[in-house]
Amino acid sequence: TKSFKGEARMEGRVILVTERAQKTVVGQFHCGPQYNYVMPFDQRIPFEIVIPHGQEFPDVEAGYPKPPAQVGPAQESVEPTAIPTLSEGVNPMQVVPTRDPLTPGPSPPRERGGLISPGTLSRHRQFGGESEGRSAVAPASRRQNARDLDELIVDVEITTYPRPAALPRGRVLEVLGRREEFGVDVEIMIRKFHLPHRFPPDVVAEASAAPQYIPERDPALRDRRDFRGLPIVTIDGETAKDFDDAVYVERLAWGNYLLHVHIADVAHYVRPGSALDREARLRGTSVYFPDRAVPMLPLELSSGICSLNPHVDRLVMSALLEFDPEGRLVEYELLPGIIRSAERMTYTAVRDILAGEPAACQRYAALIPNFKLMEELARLLARRREDRGSIDFDLPEPEIEFDEHGRMTGITRSERNFAHRIIEEFMLAANEAVASYLEGKGIPSLYRIHEKPDVKKVIEFEEIAATFGYSLGIELPPARRARLRLRDERDRYPRFHEAFEGELKISPYNYQRLAQRLEGKPEERILSYLMLRSLKQARYSEENVGHFALAAPTYTHFTSPIRRYPDLIVHRILKAALAQEGGSARTIREQGTGNREQGIGNRIRGEGLRAPANPVRERDARATAGETPAPQLPGAAFVHPEELHALGLETSESERHAAEAERELMEWKKVSFMAQHVGDEFEALIIGLIKQGFFVELTDLFVEGFVPLSNLGDDSYVYHERLRAIIGQHSKRAFRLGERTRVCLVRIDRSENKLEFSVAE
């Protein structure tokens, strides 16, 4: 126990791990002189896992390993298995074409490196980029010995945990292939981060029972606004397969803009407590890897009936937002609807249209006026966000390039054009409107919150920024520093505790103004990166504390229910709230300009669109006539605050987990790509300094690596923390944070996925 001025906390050391939350570990199999073992990829497991004789190969049923709960000791009849290689006819690069998920008929099997029985595969395991449940198990005639597993990647179940002087033991559940084979890195990440990647039979059954189209006389349409006559479009990336959102903008007669944001009504098909719902909650989010994805929902829904595909009817939850010519929100309406997307647009195509590219303009001539209105409104909304202090870090993100065979060919900066900003602004506006409505009604909901930064993080950033001549322009609270008295004397260096008096007075404006000052400067990249690191992570919570980075008093996630479980929860709550109000809700925020005699819920929008019905009046009329009212908004459900609290914790953890898996796979692919560049020189930015050396980021490839002091052979270098520099004792040559230098790649550490550089002379 440690205490300081009445503040106490418990500290200790982990002595022995008696059991792990996850019993499976992925690693590389090694044949040793005394025993066979697996070296885990998870660096938190620093020991080998011994694989006893007879446990080297999976128990197999129809080509799949048994689940861990069913795996027993190896049967005597199961002999060691030889692993098929490329020379034996198994081609890991081959991708068998799959059918469209809406086309009847069986799915062809898809395999990478495994001999899998076609009859055991569901569509979910081989369409849409999901893991196929690989198991490289060959027929009995080709079984040989455990040496065929040497250097292969396997997934093992821990059967005996480590004890003093005794290594843990385990058995092989799956053989994934060789590390360098196509797709094996994704399989490793899926298992390392324990991402659910096979839909259980009850989930498959529910997904298969989902309708493929919406009947014209579907009772669900009676209480929905009909938007099928409007040229509504989706705008997504070129490789997107699921479309959550569709948009449309029109100019009203009095000069205001009317923004339509239509979001897939996933709650209509994924009901609370169903097998689909339980699996979606378990996954929490879709996980996107560079070459494929692990979806939250089966493809019959995510790419089928829920996806806002072009030229087909789809159920939606709609947000209609009216903005005045200054971009102020004056009124909004939330309601269920039905749309028929006119076109599946890409960011690139919209960019070309806005730039006046002839081919794009000719192809989409009928939609050009609408895209021009979208551009106008998005610029107004961006300016309004900037005026209130919203922070926008335009940091480059890497994008992996592949050839037609799936081989990685390069790393480039992902393009971010104004078409991305259009969708971003429209989704932000819809999310804020939904959050504002639910909070205004006092309805418990799930918010997307971003708290103020921690004072220590801000102080650390201020100290670094000062070396560049910059500051956030804030007044730091006074600090008290005291040395901790430790009972455990094994700590070599004294440790201190700092306490700050008073609250840190900081606002998004401080960050925004500094970001604007840095724009175009040499130090922009490094200081923007450090500013971002000083902020807390956004998360989900039932308690609304606002969103610091967006400078928004209330915010939620509503616009991506196909790939995020919190959005699905918000849809259910919103539908339950709207059902109490007769099916829709209209809110006036500010008194705008122009004709205010009619609300947006009573206007006819667009040629060919019928005047919207009044669902309350229709329901009352049906009741008066003795007709039983139709069910109101299927999938609607309020959620208890205690359950919302649990959901906030679960979904925030799922999001972090997915981000870690995506980030680590990107590092794996970068290291694999750089293997062919050992000895090459690169321009680099110094992004971090420690006593042992400095970290660099390659300017053109967005690849990070380390330059150890031992590789600086021209002098004896010392790290000066106060100066944020590494300086040669004799030459006085300095390497400072944010400076650019030229480096040479000298070594790749595959086991830890690290790159080592030296300074190029």
Give the location of each predicted region.
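Covalent nucleotidyltransferase
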Residues: 293-352, 373, 545, 550-553
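Charge-lined substrate channels and their catalytic hotspots, especially those that engage the 3′ end
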Residues: 1-100, 108, 115-260, 267-312, ...
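Append "with occasional cross-activation on large, charged helical scaffolds in nucleic-acid assemblies
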Residues: 334, 347-589, 616, 631-702, ...
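Short helix/loop capping segments that flank catalytic or ligand/cofactor-binding pockets
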Residues: 47-49, 165-167, 180-184, 243-245, ...
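Short acidic-glycine loop/turn motifs at beta-strand connectors
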Residues: 32, 252-253, 323-328, 402-405
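A generic structural signal for residues embedded in beta-strands
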Residues: 1-2, 156, 689, 743-745
